[in-house]
Amino acid sequence: MAIAVGSKLPAPPASLWENAPENSVTFPETGKIILLGVPGAFTPPCSSQIPEYIARYQEFADKGVAGIYVIAVNDIFCVKAWKEALAGGKDSQVHFCADSTGEYIKTLGLDFDASGLLGNHRSKRFAAVVENGEVKSLFVESEAPEITVTKAETVLGGL
């Protein structure tokens, strides 16, 4: 069952990693965060979507966002390299998380079969605004390559 507005965000599994194997991700229990699901690191649409979130991070922070978490169904080494490529070698306040088996994305109910192009199940492209552990807004693209309702500008406008 997919998460929905008003539902509690499930805790991430220990296998959701950031920067290194075994470096498990936890989300703050209080405050406002944004989760971004993307089909794949280094894919052209995903690589064009995320830089806007990096560039506009301070605008999100000014609206009370304590963290932005990008989740891709890729291995940790791929996701870390993607972060470094998109952030231009600079430290980014946007978190890049690897859900290598897709376990968390499946728990959220936001996976789809991308085996024809990307080899396995992947994350739908989505943006979720979560406050104090509750989903306040959820934007899901109808087609994976589209970037309309999940654009940084659109999500900022809804905060």
What is each of the regions a protein language model found here?
Residues M1-L159:
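Chalcogenol-based redox active-site neighborhoods
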